[in-house]
């Protein structure tokens, strides 16, 4: 059995470690040829997870044809949302190699140009591949340490989804199936912005009560966008791992890049400098613009999210943003 993972960053590497530890051969693709060479030579991803050993049944490559040409059980995409269209197009050009292969997407956010969620981008391009979203509270380092997490595999094909879960679920990746593919992605996108807000509150030393208030209000904003986008609501999604679970994890620990980013803002660091240094790592900064555009399109109000947008992009004062977040 072989699975290919496109994206050799922290999360892709961690997933590769978790799968390979349970006997699955993994192809791991990344763009950085030097880092890929280090992985195969030293069995460590020196750029992203330098302290974790990669088992011998992980083969890394910077040649995307190599990972698409094998008979994969599935292909897992662990790449930023803004790069997803390019990667899906590359897969589409190799359809003779991987037609009908299930695609599992771990990307979180909204595409800036189209205002589409990751599954919508993939379904537009990969019309012959079953599309699933793999999402939930899951820090890469904990997965690499073989610590358990509960995540969701969401998609329209229940029979195939449950079959995939039997293949990839183990004592580290505890996976449940859900058909609500859009609802899962709404929670995944908004939680990063809410986490920035929680970090700001914590950085200003406004207390745990205020952080809890922001999490509660943030959950309501997830529900608001969820209803506007889906025209209905599934409580199993809203209070499950991909929404409530991921929101709690991302908003309550400095191990979260988004909360850590907000903490630095709350402590008075220059916002533009922080954005320049963290743009590729902090998903909330790239999600907030298309999110606000989508909210306007759907005619919904998201007070916390618009406050973070105004703080990052419209130069409102930190005190004003905090007042709006807590009001």
UniProtKB/Swiss-Prot annotation:
Biological process terms in GO annotation: carbohydrate metabolic process; glycerol-3-phosphate biosynthetic process; glycerol-3-phosphate catabolic process; glycerophospholipid metabolic process; phospholipid biosynthetic process
Record-listed NADPH binding positions: 10-11, 31, 108, 140, 257, 281, 283
GO molecular function, one term: NAD binding
Residues that, per the record, bind sn-glycerol 3-phosphate: 108, 136, 138, 191, 246, 256-258
E.C. designation(s): 1.1.1.94
Entries under InterPro entries matching the protein: 6-PGluconate_DH-like_C_sf, 6PGD_dom2, G3P_DH_NAD-dep, G3P_DH_NAD-dep_C, G3P_DH_NAD-dep_N, NAD(P)-bd_dom_sf
Top EC class of this enzyme: oxidoreductase
Keyword annotations: Cytoplasm, Lipid biosynthesis, Lipid metabolism, NAD, NADP, Nucleotide-binding, Oxidoreductase, Phospholipid biosynthesis, Phospholipid metabolism
Active site residues per record: 191 (proton acceptor)
GO cellular component: a single term: cytosol
Catalytic activity reported: sn-glycerol 3-phosphate + NAD(+) = dihydroxyacetone phosphate + NADH + H(+); sn-glycerol 3-phosphate + NADP(+) = dihydroxyacetone phosphate + NADPH + H(+)
Subcellular location: Cytoplasm
Described purpose of this protein according to its UniProt entry: Catalyzes the reduction of the glycolytic intermediate dihydroxyacetone phosphate (DHAP) to sn-glycerol 3-phosphate (G3P), the key precursor for phospholipid synthesis.
Family from the record: Belongs to the NAD-dependent glycerol-3-phosphate dehydrogenase family.
HAMAP family documented for this protein: NAD_Glyc3P_dehydrog
Name by which UniProt lists this protein: Glycerol-3-phosphate dehydrogenase [NAD(P)+]
Native source organism of the sequence: Ehrlichia ruminantium (Cowdria ruminantium)
């Amino acid at each position: 059995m072989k699975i290919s993972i496109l994206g050799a960053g922290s999360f892709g590497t961690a997933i590769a470690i978790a799968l390979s530890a349970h006997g699955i051969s993994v192809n791991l693709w990344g763009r950085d040829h030097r880092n890929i060479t280090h992985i195969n030579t030293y069995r460590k991803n020196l750029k992203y997870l330098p302290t974790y050993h990669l088992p011998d049944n992980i083969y890394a490559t910077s040649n995307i044809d190599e990972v698409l040409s094998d008979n994969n059980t599935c292909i897992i995409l662990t790449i930023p949302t803004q790069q997803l269209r390019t990667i899906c197009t590359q897969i589409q050009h190799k359809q003779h190699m991987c037609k009908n292969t299930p695609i599992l997407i771990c990307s979180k956010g909204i595409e800036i140009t189209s205002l589409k969620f990751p599954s919508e981008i993939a379904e537009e391009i990969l019309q012959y591949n079953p599309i699933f979203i793999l999402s939930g509270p899951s820090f890469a380092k904990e997965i690499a340490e073989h610590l358990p997490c509960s995540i969701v595999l969401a998609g329209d094909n229940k029979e195939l989804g449950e079959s995939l879960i039997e293949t990839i679920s183990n004592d580290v990746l505890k996976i449940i199936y859900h058909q609500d593919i859009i609802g899962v992605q709404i929670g995944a996108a908004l939680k990063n912005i809410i986490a920035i807000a929680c970090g700001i509150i914590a950085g200003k030393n406004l207390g745990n009560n205020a952080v809890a208030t922001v999490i509660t209000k943030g959950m309501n904003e997830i529900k608001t966008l969820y209803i506007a986008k889906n025209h209905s609501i599934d409580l199993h999604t809203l209070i499950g791992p991909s929404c409530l679970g991921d929101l709690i994890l991302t908003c309550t620990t400095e191990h979260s890049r988004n909360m850590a980013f907000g903490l630095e803002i709350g402590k008075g660091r220059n916002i533009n400098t922080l954005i320049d240094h963290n743009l590729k790592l902090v998903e909330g900064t790239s999600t907030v613009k298309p999110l606000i555009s989508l909210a306007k399109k759907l005619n919904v109000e998201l007070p916390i999210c618009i406050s973070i947008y105004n703080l990052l992009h419209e130069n409102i004062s930190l005190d004003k943003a905090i007042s709006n977040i807590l009001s």
